[in-house]
């Protein structure tokens, strides 16, 4: 009589993996319904239906651990259970990283924190799976089985998981984002495919969903991308460059301040394992070209010659759906190349007759004249810090990372996403407007104090009736308090921020203090 090779529990764990998959699909449905029924950016008086990140992670951890130990009688049964649960998390992990998100009114970056923590949870569960199986083999005096092909493949998969976690930590990701992205992308495909040959019983149904999500993302990029040639590049100063593309690459209308993603042409094999670069469109739909205002970085866009080909896809909206329909008073903070986001916003507000004001922070005055003529009658305060970020002195702002066009995403560690430069940009300060900055130079600090409270009466140096220059740095809280004296009807009052993290954070704090709505540039990819 033949003895069953795996015992009665060989297929018992399949249902637990299926249960995690069903829960994952329900979570996706919840996010979709939530974003359809609740604005992405709300007035403070409206109820927030979002679960805090820590609570979501805690619930997932409790769910996975609970299912890993329930009705378990043998060590190897627990080992198998945790292995299947680890792989069952992959469909949701992959889905949360798809860009652009297929969910309605969903910014891809808003899903990345949960993606990151579920990935860490999956790695932890994978470690438990490996440790339990190792203990089982040792107890049975069968350690040699670790080196069987299908079992040793599991050891390699676990090692790849650990590499993905280590390279995703801030100290690595911030400094070598391109390498992190390549490792992450190739490792995800390896884990998804290799587990097919490692897992017993098979994981075909789970792999179907992983392959569907990853494959559809690739297919979208192929279908949505177009190969275009640069019309011109022009230096606006040492830190800013203007790049133009033919107007025909975008539809007749797009929402102002939308962004596109740029990469090497798809004919280049490296483009498939490299991250794309998001750039905000600084021109308006009515202009006869597509303009980007960028910083010179390792990605060759700023220095590319006319006629150089790139792959472009988009545009993707960055502003909330109801911004232009609800706004009646808007304060915009921009840092450096963040003007690429602010410029089309204030131009559109001016045409619509909506009250607005711009605060732009720069290291030096180079390139300002290129923008002044397009500001029209927009009330503008321009702050010149006068310091080089690399000197480590004075009031500084972080040189914007490659590909972000000087704009940031969110404050939930999202400043680390989409940042492509691999060395000096990642080491710079991003605390431009920190209230407790202790390293400000005397001149800059004096300039800041001299201008404090004078934003409404021409400041330190008046350039025109609408543009005022200041030395030093602004105080967003004071500027916002003075601009939003009337605190009634907060639904129509907005603060927008685009620039280094310090600027975004202090602008958001000012919005909370004054009770108005807040939005910062977030790539909906």
Swiss-Prot record:
The answer to whether the entry has keyword Flavoprotein is yes
Family to which the UniProt record says this protein belongs:
Belongs to the ferric reductase (FRE) family. AIM14 subfamily.
Where does the Ferric oxidoreductase domain lie?
Answer: 82-194
Tell me where on the tree of life, at the top rank, the source sits: Eukaryota
Stated membrane topology is: Multi-pass membrane protein
**Gene3D superfamilies in the cross-refs:** Nucleotide-binding domain of ferredoxin-NADP reductase (FNR) module (3.40.50.80)
GO MF entries = ferric-chelate reductase activity
Q: Return the Basic and acidic residues bias intervals.
A: 453-463
Q: Which residues form the FAD-binding FR-type domain?
A: 215-344
Q: Mark the transmembrane ranges.
A: 13-33, 52-72, 82-102, 118-138, 152-172, 179-199, 203-223
The protein's name in its UniProt record: Probable metalloreductase AIM14
User: What is the species listed in this Swiss-Prot or TrEMBL entry?
Assistant: Yarrowia lipolytica (strain CLIB 122 / E 150)
State where composition is biased (Acidic residues).
410-438
One Pfam annotation reads: FAD_binding_8
Provide the top EC class: oxidoreductase
What are its GO cellular component terms? plasma membrane
Q: What EC numbers are recorded for this enzyme?
A: 1.16.1.-
For this UniProt record, the keywords arranged alphabetically read as follows:
Electron transport, FAD, Flavoprotein, Ion transport, Membrane, NADP, Oxidoreductase, Transmembrane, Transmembrane helix, Transport
Annotated GO biological process: reductive iron assimilation
Which compartments is it annotated to reside in?
Membrane
Task: Describe the task this protein carries out.
Answer: Probable cell surface metalloreductase. May be involved in iron or copper homeostasis.
Enumerate the InterPro entries for this protein: FAD-bd_8, Fe3_Rdtase_TM_dom, Fe_red_NAD-bd_6, Ferric/Cupric_Reductase, FNR_nucleotide-bd
Segments of this protein annotated with the region Disordered = 407-478
């Amino acid at each position: 009589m033949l003895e069953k090779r795996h015992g009665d529990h060989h297929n018992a764990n399949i249902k637990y993996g299926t249960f995690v998959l069903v829960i994952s699909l329900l979570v996706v449905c919840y996010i979709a319904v939530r974003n359809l029924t609740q604005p992405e950016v709300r007035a403070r008086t409206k109820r927030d239906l979002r679960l805090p990140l820590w609570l979501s992670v805690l619930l997932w951890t409790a769910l996975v651990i609970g299912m890993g130990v329930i009705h378990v009688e043998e060590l190897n049964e627990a080992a198998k259970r945790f292995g299947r649960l680890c792989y069952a998390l992959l469909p949701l992990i992959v889905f949360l990283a798809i860009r652009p998100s297929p969910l309605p009114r969903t910014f891809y970056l808003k899903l990345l924190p949960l993606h990151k923590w579920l990935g860490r949870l999956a790695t932890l569960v994978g470690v438990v799976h490996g440790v339990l199986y190792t203990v089982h083999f040792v107890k049975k005096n069968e350690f040699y089985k670790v080196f069987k092909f299908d079992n040793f493949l599991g050891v390699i998969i676990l090692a790849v998981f650990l590499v993905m976690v280590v390279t995703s930590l801030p100290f690595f990701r911030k400094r070598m984002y391109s390498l992190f992205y390549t490792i992450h992308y190739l490792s995800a495909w390896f884990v998804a495919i290799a587990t097919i040959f490692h897992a017993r019983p098979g994981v075909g149904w789970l792999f179907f969903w992983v392959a569907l999500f990853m494959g559809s993302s690739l297919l979208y990029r192929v279908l949505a991308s177009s190969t275009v040639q640069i019309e011109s590049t022009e230096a606006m100063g040492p830190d800013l460059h203007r790049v133009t593309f033919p107007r025909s690459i975008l539809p007749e209308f797009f929402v102002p301040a939308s962004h596109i993603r740029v990469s090497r042409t798809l004919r280049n094999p490296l483009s498939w394992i490299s991250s794309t670069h998001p750039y905000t469109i600084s021109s308006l739909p009515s202009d006869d070209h597509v303009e980007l205002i960028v910083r010179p970085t390792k990605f060759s866009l700023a220095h590319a010659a006319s006629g150089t080909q790139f792959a472009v896809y988009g545009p993707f909206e960055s502003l909330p759906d109801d911004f232009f329909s609800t706004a009646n008073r808007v304060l915009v903070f921009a840092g450096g190349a963040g003007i690429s986001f602010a410029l089309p916003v204030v131009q559109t507000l001016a045409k619509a007759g909506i009250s607005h004001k711009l605060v732009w922070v720069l290291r030096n005055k180079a390139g300002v004249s290129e923008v002044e003529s397009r500001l029209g009658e927009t009330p503008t305060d321009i702050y010149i810090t006068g310091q080089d970020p690399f000197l480590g002195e004075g009031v500084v702002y972080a040189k914007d990372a490659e590909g972000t066009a000087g704009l940031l995403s969110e404050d939930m560690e999202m400043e680390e996403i989409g940042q492509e430069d691999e060395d000096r940009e990642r080491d710079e300060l991003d605390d431009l407007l920190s209230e407790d900055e202790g390293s400000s130079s005397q001149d800059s600090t004096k300039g800041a104090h001299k201008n404090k409270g004078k934003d409404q009466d021409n400041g330190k140096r008046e350039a025109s009736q609408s543009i005022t220059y200041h030395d030093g740095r602004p105080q967003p809280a004071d500027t916002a308090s003075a601009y939003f004296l009337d605190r009634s009807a907060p639904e129509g009052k907005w603060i927008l921020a685009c620039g280094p993290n310090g600027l975004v954070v202090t602008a958001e704090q000012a919005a909370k203090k004054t009770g108005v709505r807040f939005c910062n540039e977030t790539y909906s990819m």
